[in-house]
Amino acid sequence: MKSLKKQRRIQVIILATVALVLATGLIGYAMRDGINFFRAPSDIIAEPPQPSETFRIGGLVEDGTLVRGQGETVRFSVTDGGASVPVVFTGVLPDLFAENQGMIGTGRYVNGVFEASEILAKHDETYMPKEVMDALKEQGVYQAPES
């Protein structure tokens, strides 16, 4: 009788372990498209990502680079003070989007151009995303806003 209980306990433990491994694998598989890593322009130039990789880029919209094309296509460059990456975006830009202002874009880096699928602008005059602030500090061009 004891060996039957012991055998049942071992079966339950094995089944629970298999279920846990399977659940972890399914969660990881489901999240693979939902995780976007942040990169500064200097990081992209130093180590260009694969064209199939979706990630976020952040920095300042470089002065004098904002060009509105046909329809809703917009071209500009993003800089962190150390490097500059050209960006192309088709869609409606946020109201607060402007040259020399902070932005974060989501998209892919293809043939030396970041093809953005989404553009976010900073919220107000003093807000800057932490990732962008860190990248600008790393390049030595960050200026704290006047309070």
UniProtKB/Swiss-Prot annotation:
Give the way it sits in the membrane: Single-pass type II membrane protein
Per UniProt, the keywords (alphabetical) are:
Cell inner membrane, Cell membrane, Cytochrome c-type biogenesis, Heme, Iron, Membrane, Metal-binding, Signal-anchor, Transmembrane, Transmembrane helix
Assigned GO CC terms? plasma membrane
Question: Any idea what this protein is called?
Answer: Cytochrome c-type biogenesis protein CcmE 1
Annotated GO molecular function terms are: heme binding; metal ion binding
Please explain the role this protein plays, according to its UniProt record. Heme chaperone required for the biogenesis of c-type cytochromes. Transiently binds heme delivered by CcmC and transfers the heme to apo-cytochromes in a process facilitated by CcmF and CcmH.
Q: Indicate the family of this protein.
A: Belongs to the CcmE/CycJ family.
What InterPro entries does its record include? CcmE, CcmE-like_sf, NA-bd_OB-fold
List the stretches on the Periplasmic face of the membrane: 31-147
Location(s) in or outside the cell: Cell inner membrane
Q: Which Pfam families match?
A: CcmE
List ligand-binding residues for heme. H123, Y127
> Which organism is this entry from?
Ruegeria pomeroyi (strain ATCC 700808 / DSM 15171 / DSS-3) (Silicibacter pomeroyi)
Tell me where the transmembrane regions lie: 10-30
Q: Which residues lie on this side of the membrane: Cytoplasmic?
A: 1-9
Gene Ontology biological process terms in this record? cytochrome complex assembly
- Report the leader peptide range: none
